[in-house]
A protein has these predicted regions:
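Loop/turn elements at helix/coil->beta-strand transitions in domains of secreted/extracellular proteins
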Residues: 7-13, 27-29, 51-56, 83-90, ...
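Flexible loop/hinge segments that line or gate small-molecule binding clefts
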Residues: 4-38
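An alpha-beta-alpha
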Residues: 36-92
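Solvent-exposed loop/turn segments at secondary-structure junctions
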Residues: 18-23, 62-66, 96-99, 135-139
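Extracellular/periplasmic periplasmic-binding protein-like sensory domains
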Residues: 29, 78-89, 139-174
């Protein structure tokens, strides 16, 4: 963005739903749009409960939870909403896909984590809602929901297609 601004001083930079630190993004962007994540948490947990969830598993990464106050607040909102709705809340700090293990490593971690949670009796049955702040693992959550009969409530970003096309081998148009 700084390179573009050096060529055109009138360029306006807008960031929508930053995954990085607000401090970092706001030093680059002229305008930042973010969802009301407390409302998102309330809506997602309510939808999970409506679909029969008794457990809610949130996967996130350190870069989101520690570097981005919005995601940190999201974690707290999910926990509070789960308590209010009577759902067992489980947080799992997962592998960041930008590091050495990459996206495949992050996806593998999610699969192994679900197995560990079952083995350690942190969750049971198929009344388990899955959510992650990491867009690179959405297809893994969809696969787990499909293959194990779990609940995939929605992706982390406001799109109905994140992860679905990959799993169901559908071309996304538009």
């Amino acid at each position: 963005m700084r390179s573009a601004e050096s060529v055109n001083k009138n360029i306006v930079t807008i960031c929508i739903e930053p995954e990085e630190s607000i401090e970092t993004i706001s030093s680059i962007a002229d305008l930042v749009f973010c969802a009301d994540w407390a409302k998102v948490a309330a809506d997602v947990v309510a939808a999970a409960k409506e679909q029969g969830a008794e457990h809610f598993v949130l996967f996130s990464i350190n870069r989101h939870i520690t570097n981005n106050p919005m995601y940190s607040a999201l974690n707290a909102s999910f926990k509070a909403e789960c308590e209010a709705q009577g759902l067992n809340y489980v947080y799992d700090n997962s592998v960041d896909p930008i590091y050495s293990s990459g996206i495949k490593g992050a996806q593998l971690y999610i699969k192994e984590s679900i197995a560990r949670l079952f083995n350690n009796e942190k969750i049971n049955g198929n009344n388990i809602a899955l959510f992650s702040t990491d867009s690179s693992v959405q297809s893994t959550l969809v696969e787990l929901a499909r293959d194990r009969g779990l609940i995939y409530v929605c992706p982390s970003f406001p799109t109905a297609y994140n992860g679905l096309g990959e799993v169901f081998d559908k071309e996304q148009v538009g």
